[in-house]
Curated annotation (Swiss-Prot):
PANTHER family: DIHYDROANTICAPSIN 7-DEHYDROGENASE. NADP(+) binds at S15, S16, I18, S38, N39, R42, D65, K129, T194. This is Short-chain dehydrogenase/reductase ATR9. Belongs to the short-chain dehydrogenases/reductases (SDR) family. The active site is at S147 (proton donor). Pathway: Mycotoxin biosynthesis. The keyword NADP applies. GO terms for molecular function: monooxygenase activity.
Length: 253
């Protein structure tokens, strides 16, 4: 099996949820991990948790806010800080950052688009523009974005987010052509129980159980389930321009 041990990875949005799970698994595989998020406190908390779970982990934390329109310069600053701190170019970039709070079509306005565009529409393209300058330009290297099941199977009430992930899927394939031999892929999760569901509570547990009971597997995905797909895409040096689904069979229902 191909190894990623000793390689260097930056996870943008790696302080919680799926990104934090990817960071944990990567540390366990002996990867040098850099985690970036908009909240310094969450980054520090995530690092402490991962270091407790994987004592031998090589992990650093950084802060970056990609919700503003000057995100290109913010990304350039982040990538420079990471390669300076780790002592060399990156092998992999993973982007899991997102808010998950897009409005419904009836509430959608041009202002709502302007507020969500930097993170959900512009950031992936800017990562594709900026990241290669700080990466090993080789087919072993990869960029992996985070898409969503609504891009392939929309649901009523989720038109806006379906449009965003549909655009990301198209960008993923186009960037695979533009950035070759660096591989570009995306993971498309279905419903996944992360912090975005809200704080732990009995009511949340019941809601998650009810939603899971309707799925093909009788459960919802967990960050650790979906994180496996990102690790796979880093390992598989023959995959590019691909959207990998991790949704519990949602497209079959």
């Amino acid at each position: 099996m191909p190894t990623i041990r000793g390689q260097s990875i930056l996870i943008i949005g790696g302080s919680s949820g799926i990104g934090a799970a990817v960071a944990k698994y990567a540390c366990g595989d002996g990867v040098k991990v850099s985690v970036a998020s908009s909240n310094k406190g969450r980054v520090e908390k995530a690092l402490k948790k991962i270091q407790a779970l994987v004592p031998a982990s090589e992990i650093l934390g950084f802060t970056v806010d990609l919700s503003q329109y000057d995100l290109e310069s913010r990304l350039e600053k982040l990538f420079k800080e990471v390669v300076d701190a780790t002592g060399g170019p990156l092998d992999h970039v993973v982007m899991t950052a997102g808010t998950g709070n897009m409005v419904s079509l009836s509430e959608y306005t041009a202002k709502a688009f302007q507020e969500s565009a930097p993170l959900h529409f512009i950031a992936p393209l800017m990562v594709g523009k900026v990241a290669p300058r700080f990466m090993n330009r080789h087919w072993k290297s990869s960029i992996t974005f985070t898409s969503g099941a609504f891009g392939k199977k929309p649901a009523k009430g989720y038109c806006v987010i379906a449009s965003a992930v549909g655009a990301l899927d198209a960008a993923t394939r186009a960037l695979a052509l533009e950035l070759a031999p660096i591989r570009v892929n995306a993971v498309s999760p279905g419903p996944t129980v992360t912090e975005m569901f809200g704080p732990p509570s009995e009511a949340l547990d019941k809601a998650v159980a009810a939603m899971g009971a309707q799925s093909l597997l009788g459960k919802l995905g967990r960050p650790e389930d979906v994180a496996e797909a990102y690790i796979y895409l880093m390992r598989d040096a023959n995959t590019t321009g691909t959207i990998v689904d991790s949704n519990g069979g949602a497209f079959l229902q």
